[in-house]
UniProtKB/Swiss-Prot annotation:
Residues 1-24 form the signal peptide. The gene is GNRH2. GO terms for cellular component: extracellular space. Stimulates the secretion of gonadotropins; it stimulates the secretion of both luteinizing and follicle-stimulating hormones. It is found in: Secreted. This is Progonadoliberin-2. The keyword Chloroplast does not apply. PROSITE patterns: GNRH. Residues 35-59 are annotated as: Disordered. The modification Glycine amide is found at G34. Its main location: secreted. It comes from Macaca mulatta (Rhesus macaque). InterPro entries: GnRH, Gonadoliberin. One of its GO terms (molecular function) is gonadotropin-releasing hormone receptor binding.
Amino acid sequence: MASSRRGLLLLLMLLTAHPGPSEAQHWSHGWYPGGKRALSSAQDPQNALRPPAGSPAQATYGLPSDALAHLEDSMPWEGRTMAWWSLRRKRYLAQTLLTAAREPRPVPPSSNKV
């Protein structure tokens, strides 16, 4: 009876005690945000050949090849599409409001008919 209680208590402690989220990145996420790997990068960045010390390439070795890419190139196509459509909606709304403000408002029919 005591061993079953001890086992149940141990099981309960194991189920409730959680070490927290892992700081490691899952292999499917890649090295860069969005889960993409640069095509020019080696499969294992630790074993990549480094340029000689003192060369200009040594200073930029730690940067990914697309670190200075334009926003459109670095954004996934889903994000680009969503940003484009929200921009078009905002532009359409602003245009509609501006043209509605310029047009004269129709005079409502009077209810004082004799």
